[in-house]
Amino acid sequence: WAGKSFGFVQVPRIGQEVVVDFLEGDPDQPLITGRVYNAEQMPPWDLPANATQSGVLSRSSKGGGYGNANALRFEDKKGSEQVWLHAEKNQDIEVENDETHWVGHDRTKTIDHDETVHVKHDRTETVDNNETITIGVDRTESVGSNESITIGSNRTETVGVDESITIGANRTEAVGSNETISIGSNRSVTVG
């Protein structure tokens, strides 16, 4: 597949066995039409054990070892179907318009270092059941304008050491029924 500034490109590597044709039978116009495996250049996945697997696996250029490769593999074994994508280093995905993901069961995501998410417009997140967030060290949250929190039932907040609350202007607190305050030592209130 070849066109003006588009098409499929895969340059043969040194040592590969190629299939050569000749334009109009002219030996001065050789054309590589394909490549084949041989005893020294075997497929990336063992056969016949992995006969249900197909895909593309490249090798890193000079200086890379056997385990250095980019790969896209399809496993079509009934009950074990899988699409496996491996980037030897970076992976960059660009979507010019919308992107949709659907996962029929569970999803697990692990990031060994940092993550940055930048949403330039609105964001909506819905969890139909429970949510648990665990933060190993500190957390900072900044809201540029207003914040509203609605809790349908009870709320429990526990602070292990100190807590400081600063309100720049007014504060209104309404308790629909009873309120109990327990202070282990001193309390100081200053008005004005």
Predicted regions, residues:
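Structural signature for extended repeat/solenoid scaffolds and their inter-repeat hinge/linker regions
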Residues: 1-192
